[in-house]
Amino acid sequence: MRFLGALLVGLLGWVGSTLAGEVGVTDKTILIGMTAPFSGSSGPYGQDMRTVIQAYFRQVNEAGGINGRKLELRALDDGYETDKAVANTRTLISADRVFALLASYGSSPTTAAMNEVFGVAKVPLVGTISGADSIRQSPKDNRNNRYMFNVRASYANETEAIVNQLVSLGFKNIAVLYQNDGFGNSGLDGVVSALKKHNQTPSAIATVERNSTDVAKAAAIIAKVNPQAVVMVTLYKATAAFVQEMRKAKQAPQFMTLSPVGADLLVQELGDEARGVGISQVMPYPWNDTVPVVREYQSVIGKQAKPSYYGLEAYVMAKVLVDAIRKSGKDLTREKLVASLEAMQNHDLGGYRVSFSPNERLGSRYVDLTVIGSGGRVLR
């Protein structure tokens, strides 16, 4: 009887705490889920993001949390593999019972997870490292998109900025290297569309498989046209391998790539050979502490990590989620969180703004062009 009584008290306490709010919400905690690569060639991207989010959550919790509740993060490694990302999302929602999702990674993984798991389960995801159109559709066109909130510009925005810059410099022989997945295909479509506006087409197109550095064939295809510029829709390992392969072939085009490459990681991989590579960015310059959101981000990470575009983007994602949870009130539910996010129109995070509405999931159109200078410094 004593055991049964203790069990009953425990069950009543558990029921009381879980009934405090939605799934993943108790009187004292809010559980947030994350799936991203923490291992493999893309592991450094996810590790940087997780470090920043954990640091920011600590800051929020030390200041009293949100309506007395502390934020907890449950982060799973997907290795930038679509099947694993989908499985992790299912685990986070069904087994771990998280309240919401934060900071995913990759176009194909996020699109599949949205359409197969979190969109169907009506669990919001705030932020992913992807500019794919598939996760930016209006909820009117795909009801699963109602639960996807992007905080960065699209690949169409990035590639248009890159192409416009190259064309303004008089370049007419522009080739494309893309990785064979959702990211690569979205970027390729963006380049083709942007060139079409200038009555141009890519002079050559070549591909590399995701998570691969086997770029010799692609470099040979592109080198044949002696391009003035190459837009590389690839991550840092493949990008570095391609640049080196092209230089071995005595090719010296203007190399351009998109924000997911990670400037710091590309510099680590290429060393001095990274000099001159242009990169489109979708966040403010993370070393410019005159921008309030950058200053906050730098303060949060302290000496735990070096400033980076990935780190700043993770901070922006986490801040958008925290702001929306605060606006949702103490009686927290997923639907209230969605409503709070949809009400964020021209929401100022401190020099960086995001906008949503019931039918808008783009979040931002901000694009900046940078170039890697001497010593691996990112220059604007």
List where the protein language model places each region:
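Immediate post-signal peptide segment of exported/extracytoplasmic ligand-binding proteins
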Residues: 20-34, 65-70, 166-172, 331
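Beta-alpha junction/loop-to-helix N-cap segments that form part of ligand/metal-binding clefts
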Residues: 21, 29-31, 44-51, 59, ...
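Short, low-complexity disordered leader/linker segments with a strong preference
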Residues: 1-31
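Extracellular/periplasmic periplasmic-binding protein-like sensory domains
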Residues: 243-315, 376-379
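Extracytoplasmic "Venus flytrap"
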Residues: 23-52, 76-83, 105-106, 177-185, ...
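Solvent-exposed loop/turn segments at secondary-structure junctions
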Residues: 38-41, 78-82, 106-111, 130-135, ...
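Extracytoplasmic ligand/sensor domains, especially the bilobed periplasmic-binding protein
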Residues: 97-205, 254-275
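Segments of small-molecule ligand-sensing domains
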Residues: 301-311, 322-379
